[in-house]
Each structure stands twice: as structure tokens, then as C-alpha cells.
Design a protein with these regions (language model features):
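Mature extracytoplasmic/periplasmic domains
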Residues: 290-350
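Short beta-strand->loop
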Residues: 121-132, 268-281, 290-293
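Early extracytoplasmic/lumenal segment of secretory-pathway proteins
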Residues: 31, 40-113
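Conserved C-terminal helix/tail region of periplasmic/extracytoplasmic solute-binding proteins
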Residues: 346-376
């Protein structure tokens, strides 16, 4: 592989965060309630879709095609002022510190926390020209578990979790989470540095609920994961580079990162991506507008601009993640032709394997289990 082709992906920097950030009750949702009455009133007021200032943008690094930014700035005569986070906990910390952004991109469970904490503006889909291509084409997002009727969000990307591996070193796998225990890969296996993903993998392997917070279940999950430790090279969310540079023979991986890797691989046939028959977690990122956004009208224009099919196609090819906008499916299918299991299907959504927020006791139990797994 060409070393100069390597670069970090959107997920490369994701980390599990501290236990304190993850044990917050569903009611508080990890966010300090907005104390400014003006912000609370604004959150209830419909957004007037018009330019009302530059766009203050807060997202993962390198997760929108730069030419899309350029086109938006030229069309609307505004600047995109970018800031980046490297975890959802980092995003939450900035919001709790009072920083003001026009557009953010939380994952599903964090969108639920934000909305429950009164931290998001409502989004009137009727004011978005591109909304029908999303909500009319993807019924799941018309009323997702994390945001009833998508009142505060518009879906940005979706993806699932599986196993990436090097065929040139391991040959074919069996289509099971058991493959992470493959003796041929011992010492060259990574799992994601992500609490929910790793505990979830162990739970699915055992036939347990994906986000179980039951102490007995988690004890079994912990025992299973401890048996994996001799096979591990480490915990890392940089699946893309670990496979490309030969640091890993096998890794737990997000489908979007595997799709992005294909664009850099000299020979895609060297690699494989599988979804385990025991189940594949599905997740999504969302567009959301904070309650204290200084320029919500510009944010609405940006969401609508991003929903244009030509911009969706550019971004799919740039980041490797599918975007649920009708008419763009062929773009992603062509991108992942060597890895068809990267596609997120209707059956994947129906399987209901989502990382949901638990109650305080369950989240604390999961934190403790994760700490134990990481400690070895």
C-alpha cells in the first residue's frame, strides 16, 4: 500500500470517552440544561430559512467534501467557520461550556440526549426542499427511535459495524464474530476503541441484548472479551489505516471506513469486510441545530444544500459513508461493489440493533464492564 495515501478517517479519532460522560441519566442526557430564557424561547420558534449570518460549523474533521463548502459559500455569500471535535463527549463539553454553533452532527443516541435536554431547535421539514427525498424515500427516518417524527434532526449518514480483514493473510472468514478469535490472526487483531461497540460485539456473540445493562449479562460479556485479549494487538478506531499499512490482519470496523479504504487500496481484493450473522449494530449521524445557534436560518440553508443529490453524491465518494437521500443509492453501491456488506439495508434497520441510551444504573454497569475489559 502507498504510505502517502494514508490519512485519518472521520472515525479514526473516536474514543470511548470518560466513564463520567457516559453514566449520565437519560433525563439529563449528558448536557447542562440551557439557562438562557432567550435560548429556550428560540428553541420553540420556527426557523426562518434565510441567510442570517455566516455558518458556524461543528463536526468531525474532514467529513464534508471541501468543494461542497466552496459551492455553498459562493451561492449564499457566506463563510463557513469550521471547528472540529474528536468525540461525542468533546462535542458535549463544548456545548455545555456555552459555545455557540449553527450546525452539529451528533450520533443517534447523542441526538436523543440533546433533544431530551432541550438543547436542539425544532426543524420543520416542510421548509426543506430536499426533505421529501429523505423522509419519503427512507421511512425509518420519518419516526426514528432517537427523535420521534425527526422533529429535531435530519439524517446525515448511516453505517454498520462488522469485521475488516486481509484476505492475503487469512483467506476467507466464517461470517461470525467468532472470527475475531481466529488463531491465524493472533496478535494482529484490533477491536474498536469504543465502549458500546466492543461490549455490543461480546453481547451479540453470546446472544444477549446489544446494550444490556444487566450485571449478570455483563459478567458473561466480560469473560468472553477477556478470552479475546491474547489475540489483540490493541484497541483502535483507526481500522482504515491499520489494515492498509499491515498493522492489523483483522479488525472490528465501521462500514464507512472500509468503503473509504477501498479508494486508497492498490488492490481491493486483498481486503474483505463481513457482517456477523449474530447481528450487526447500525448507527447514524444527524444534522442538528443547537437551541442557541446564532444563525439558524443559514444552518437550514446548509442542510438543504447538502441534501441536493449532486452534493450528496460528492460527499458519499469523499467520506465513504452512505447518505439516506433518494436517488443517490447507486453512487454508494458502486463505491462498495467489492464490499457489498457495507450497504445498510431495510433488513438491517428492521433488526433494531441500535445503541440506545440506558438508565443510570445500566450505564454505570456498562462503564464498569468497559473499564475492566480495557484494563485486561
Amino acid at each position: 500500500m502507498s504510505p502517502e495515501a494514508l490519512h485519518p478517517t472521520r472515525r479514526s479519532f473516536l474514543r470511548a470517552g470518560t466513564a463520567a460522560a457516559l453514566t449520565l441519566a437519560a433525563a439529563g442526557c449528558g448536557f447542562a440544561s440551557g439557562d438562557d430564557p432567550a435560548d429556550a424561547e428560540a428553541a420553540r420558534t420556527p426557523i426562518d430559512v434565510k441567510v442570517d449570518g455566516d455558518l458556524v460549523y461543528f463536526n468531525w474533521a474532514d467529513f464534508v467534501d471541501p468543494t461542497v463548502f466552496e459551492g455553498f459559500q459562493k451561492e449564499y455569500g457566506v463563510k463557513v467557520i469550521q471547528s472540529n471535535y474528536d468525540s461525542m463527549e468533546g462535542m458535549a463539553a463544548k456545548l455545555n461550556a456555552g459555545n455557540r454553533y449553527d450546525i452539529i452532527f451528533p450520533t443517534a443516541k447523542w441526538a436523543q440526549r440533546l433533544a431530551a435536554g432541550g438543547r436542539l431547535r425544532g426543524i420543520d421539514h416542510s421548509r426543506l426542499r430536499g426533505a421529501e427525498a429523505v423522509f419519503g424515500g427512507y421511512g425509518y427516518f420519518a419516526d426514528p427511535w432517537y427523535d420521534p417524527r425527526s422533529e429535531h434532526t435530519v439524517p446525515f449518514t448511516m453505517y454498520k459495524t462488522g469485521i475488516g480483514w486481509r484476505r492475503d493473510r487469512l483467506g476467507d472468514l466464517t461470517g461470525s464474530w467468532d472470527d475475531l478469535w481466529n488463531a491465524k490472526a493472533k496478535g494482529k487483531v484490533f477491536v474498536l476503541d469504543d465502549r458500546d461497540e466492543v461490549l455490543g460485539m461480546g453481547a451479540l456473540k453470546l446472544g444477549l441484548p446489544l446494550t444490556t445493562g444487566d450485571g449478570g449479562d455483563l459478567a458473561r460479556v466480560g469473560e468472553t472479551l477477556h478470552s479475546l485479549r491474547p489475540h489483540l494487538r490493541g484497541f483502535s478506531s483507526d481500522s482504515y489505516n491499520n489494515l492498509l499499512n499491515g498493522n492489523a490482519d483483522m479488525t472490528q470496523a465501521w462500514s464507512g471506513d472500509m468503503a473509504a479504504m477501498l479508494a486508497q487500496a492498490e488492490d481491493p481484493a486483498v481486503f474483505g469486510f463481513e457482517v456477523a450473522r449474530e447481528g450487526a449494530p447500525v448507527n447514524s449521524d444527524c444534522y442538528a441545530i443547537p437551541a442557541n445557534a446564532p444563525h439558524p436560518g443559514t444552518a437550514m440553508l446548509f442542510i438543504d444544500y447538502m441534501l441536493r443529490p449532486e452534493n450528496v453524491k460528492k460527499n458519499i465518494e469523499y467520506i465513504g459513508y452512505p447518505m439516506p437521500v433518494r436517488g443517490t443509492e447507486d453512487t454508494y453501491a458502486a463505491l462498495v461493489e467489492p464490499f457489498p456488506q457495507c450497504l445498510v439495508t431495510a433488513d438491517d434497520l428492521k433488526a433494531d440493533l441500535f445503541f440506545r441510551n440506558g438508565d443510570t444504573r445500566g450505564e454505570q454497569a456498562r462503564d464498569a464492564a468497559w473499564t475492566d475489559v480495557k484494563a485486561g
